[in-house]
């Protein structure tokens, strides 16, 4: 410790601060700087030529002797990657010739498939209708034969055969509706019973004609 540090703060020099060592540097003044105060007759300084004395504390001296290393990852946040936050701008690619050709080919294939399906459905349903008509004719012939056989057993003639024939037609249609696989395995629809009934009616028109003619003669 120096003598200046052992003394009290009273009477200490102006550049003395407790706990701080000072570096004494000479202060040079210009004669023009000194001016006399007319009231107090004390010279005052307006401008200092030399710099202000530099004071250094013990802590700053220790810090300068042992510089600290600052790691970016310890206390300082990492800089944000701007590329992550920025939205990706997707460039719209114009369709190439290959893509256009592929779309055209797909549309053509879809049209071909639709045409084939309509053709197959038309042939299938058309074939079903033709088969229904043929089946109706065969069933009409069978109904006529069965009606004549029943009428011959009971000795019925003329208009008496009509109710028997009508009952047989209803029974045949009912059987086809309940289990169409027994009588007609190829049937896949149930909306062509009218097509079946018309051939039966036409085939069995002989008994219907007799019935309506006798009914007309009665009235």
Curated annotation (Swiss-Prot):
Gene Ontology CC terms: membrane
Positions of the UniProt region annotated as Disordered: 70-102
Ranges of biased composition (kind: Basic and acidic residues): 73-101
Localization per record: Membrane
Species annotation: Acanthamoeba polyphaga mimivirus
Topology versus the membrane: Multi-pass membrane protein
TM region(s), chain numbering: 126-146, 153-173, 192-212
Keyword terms: Coiled coil, Membrane, Transmembrane, Transmembrane helix
Top-level taxon of the source organism: Viruses
Protein name (Swiss-Prot/TrEMBL): Uncharacterized protein L631
Disulphide bonds in the chain: none
Coiled coil: 96-120
